[in-house]
């Protein structure tokens, strides 16, 4: 793993000259990518901050406390060769494919203010708005366009170190999202939310 990381890390300056290590995964294997995240979080130099970009082939990623049988339509997953993996952080199940880009920040958390998910999500929304995409941070951990989610985010905290990761759906297959994820009845209180597909969207159609 260490040799692989040495081949794919780069450094760039941000926040007035502070060095952040950039890691771009060469793999679309979900097991590899989640292992890479954990390795960087647990084993890499804690004096450094890290930013990762990665993609998974067709995969459902469930939160650390979720029941896979409750969250995933296993028949659909098997038929479509969709992997099911568990991440370190909590939160809900999300679908990944190559139309989705995942990002991860790993840094030291000085106090509770560093755990505010909006600190990570708001710059993404602002960047998209600068491109005339009407993105908004809403709820506890989502970024949406016109009320439809395109980014889910979650965090993991251990010994003063925080991992924040999220999804960016550019051109994911929304029909698969609807088929493979089970949604509890309380998610459908709004009459506008007729299906999973009705509540999610891609970024690409809104880009100029």
What would you call each of these model-derived segments?
Residues 3-19:
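Short, Lys/Arg-enriched N-terminal segments with co-localized hydrophobic residues
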Residues 17-69, 155, 180, 200-208:
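Active-site loop/lid in soluble adenylation, ligation, and acyl-transfer enzymes
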Residues 50, 56-59, 65, 82, ...:
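Membrane helical hairpin/interfacial module
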Residues 71-93:
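Active-site cofactor/substrate anionic-group-binding motifs, chiefly glycine-
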Residues 88-108, 186-205:
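Residues forming anionic-ligand binding surfaces in small-molecule and nucleic-acid pockets
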Residues 100-141:
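Contiguous, small/hydrophobic- and glycine-enriched helical/loop subdomains that border
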Residues 124, 131-132, 151, 159-208:
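Long, positively charged amphipathic alpha-helical accessory segments at protein N-termini or as interdomain linkers
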Residues 137-154:
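Beta-rich nucleic-acid/ligand-interaction surfaces
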């Amino acid at each position: 793993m260490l040799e692989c990381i040495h081949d794919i890390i780069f450094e760039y300056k941000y926040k007035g000259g502070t060095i952040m290590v950039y890691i771009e995964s060469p793999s679309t294997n979900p097991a590899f990518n989640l292992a890479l995240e954990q390795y960087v979080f647990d084993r890499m130099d804690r004096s450094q901050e890290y930013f990762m970009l990665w993609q998974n082939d067709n995969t459902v990623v469930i939160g650390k406390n979720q029941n896979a049988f409750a969250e995933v339509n296993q028949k659909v997953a098997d038929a479509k060769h969709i992997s099911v993996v568990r991440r370190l952080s909590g939160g809900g199940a999300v679908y990944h494919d190559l139309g989705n880009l995942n990002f991860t920040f790993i840094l030291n958390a000085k106090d509770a203010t560093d755990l505010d998910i909006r600190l990570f999500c708001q710059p993404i929304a602002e960047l998209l708005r600068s491109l005339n995409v009407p993105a908004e941070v809403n709820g506890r951990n989502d970024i949406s366009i016109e009320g439809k989610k395109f980014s889910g985010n979650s965090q993991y905290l251990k010994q003063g170190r925080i991992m924040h990761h999220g999804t960016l759906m550019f051109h994911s297959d929304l029909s698969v999202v609807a088929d493979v994820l089970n949604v509890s009845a309380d998610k459908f209180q709004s009459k506008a939310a007729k299906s999973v597909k009705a509540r999610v969207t891609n970024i690409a159609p809104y880009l100029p």
